[in-house]
A protein has these predicted regions:
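Proline-centered linker/hinge motifs at extracellular inter-domain junctions
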Residues: 35, 131-136, 147-166
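Short, solvent-exposed loop/linker segments at the N-terminal edge
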Residues: 43-45, 175-183
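Residue-level recognition of secondary-structure-to-loop junctions
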Residues: 44, 102, 225-229
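Extracellular acidic, Ser/Thr/Pro-rich low-complexity tracts
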Residues: 56-60, 189-195, 208, 241
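Low-complexity "stalk/linker" and mucin-like segments enriched in Ser/Thr/Pro/Ala/Gly
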Residues: 84, 170-172, 196-199, 205-222
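A short beta-strand segment in extracellular, disulfide-stabilized domains
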Residues: 181-191
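C-terminal edge beta-strand
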Residues: 246-254
C-alpha cells in the first residue's frame, strides 16, 4: 500500500507541476527544434554492391519520435525502410545502413518533417567526395556482410557495447578499486533500433576472479560492483537487441 500511494502521489505531483504556468510550453520547447536526416556516404563493396550510410542530427534536448509515414519517409519506393523513429539529442552517425545493387542510380532520399519543418538528405549520393574510407568503412561495416544482407532496407547490426574510461586510446587496460570499495561501472549499450519491436538489454556478469562480485543492478549498463576478496577479476558486459549480442570484458584489480 505504501508503494502504491507513493507512485500515485508522485504522478499527481508531476501533473501539478505540468499545470503550472509556462511548464507545458517548457516541455514542448524541449522537443520543438529541428531534426535533420544526414547522409554519411557510401562504400564500394567487393561484390559490386554499394553500402549507404544515413545518420541524423537533432537540436532537441529530449528524444523526439517521428513515426514512419508522411513525416518520416524514404523515396522513391516504399516509405518504410526500417529507418529510425526515435531521435535522440545530438548527432548520431551510422544509424541506417543500406545495401543496394550495383545498378543503383543514386536516387534514395530520406525526408523528415518535425514541427512543420521538412528536410531531406543529399540527392548527389555517388559523388567521389561522399565515398567513405578509413574509420568510416570500419564503423559502417561493423557486424554484417553486404553479400548476405537484404537490399534497400536498413540492416540490423549488433549493438555497440562500451565501458567509459576503459581500454582504447584514452583509458587504462585495467580498473582498480580498494578492497571493500565500490567500483563504478559506466557501461553503455547503443543500438540503431532494429529489429522493430525488439528490446535492448544489458547484463553484467563475473567471468573469473578469486572471490564473488555483487552488482547493484546487473541488468543496468551503469552500475556499482563490490568484490569479496582481493585479486584480479574479469567482468563482462553483454548487450543485446533481441537478435544480436555483443560483449566487452573488463579487467578489475582489487587491492
Amino acid at each position: 500500500m505504501t508503494t502504491r500511494t507513493f507512485v500515485v502521489t508522485g504522478l499527481m505531483a508531476v501533473i501539478a507541476w505540468m499545470a503550472l504556468p509556462g511548464m507545458t510550453n517548457l516541455v514542448v520547447a524541449q522537443s520543438s527544434f529541428s531534426v535533420y536526416p544526414v547522409y554519411d556516404g557510401f562504400i564500394n563493396n567487393s561484390d559490386g554492391t554499394l553500402t549507404l550510410s544515413f545518420a541524423y542530427f537533432s537540436h532537441n534536448r529530449e528524444a523526439v519520435t517521428i513515426p514512419i509515414g508522411p513525416d518520416n519517409v524514404f523515396s522513391p519506393g516504399p516509405r518504410n525502410r526500417g529507418q529510425p523513429e526515435m531521435f535522440l539529442p545530438g548527432h548520431h552517425r551510422w544509424q541506417c545502413i543500406v545495401v543496394v545493387d550495383e545498378d543503383f542510380d543514386g536516387d534514395f532520399v530520406w525526408t523528415l518533417t518535425h514541427r512543420g519543418e521538412t528536410t531531406s538528405t543529399s540527392t548527389s549520393m555517388l559523388q567521389y567526395s561522399w565515398e567513405l574510407d578509413g574509420s568510416g568503412v570500419v564503423a559502417v561495416g561493423r557486424g554484417f556482410t553486404p553479400e548476405s544482407s537484404p537490399r534497400n532496407t536498413c540492416v540490423n547490426r549488433p549493438p555497440i557495447v562500451r565501458v567509459l574510461g576503459y581500454g582504447g586510446r584514452r583509458g587504462p587496460d585495467e580498473l582498480r578499486v580498494p578492497v571493500g570499495g565500490e567500483l563504478k561501472l559506466f557501461g553503455s549499450v547503443r543500438d540503431e533500433g532494429l529489429p522493430k519491436g525488439g528490446m535492448v538489454t544489458a547484463e553484467w556478469r563475473m567471468v573469473s576472479g578469486p572471490g564473488t562480485t555483487t552488482f547493484a543492478d546487473a541488468t543496468s549498463a551503469r552500475t556499482l560492483a563490490n568484490f569479496s576478496a582481493s585479486g584480479t577479476y574479469e567482468l563482462e558486459l553483454l548487450g543485446s537487441d533481441s537478435v544480436f549480442d555483443e560483449t566487452i570484458r573488463v579487467t578489475v584489480v582489487v587491492e
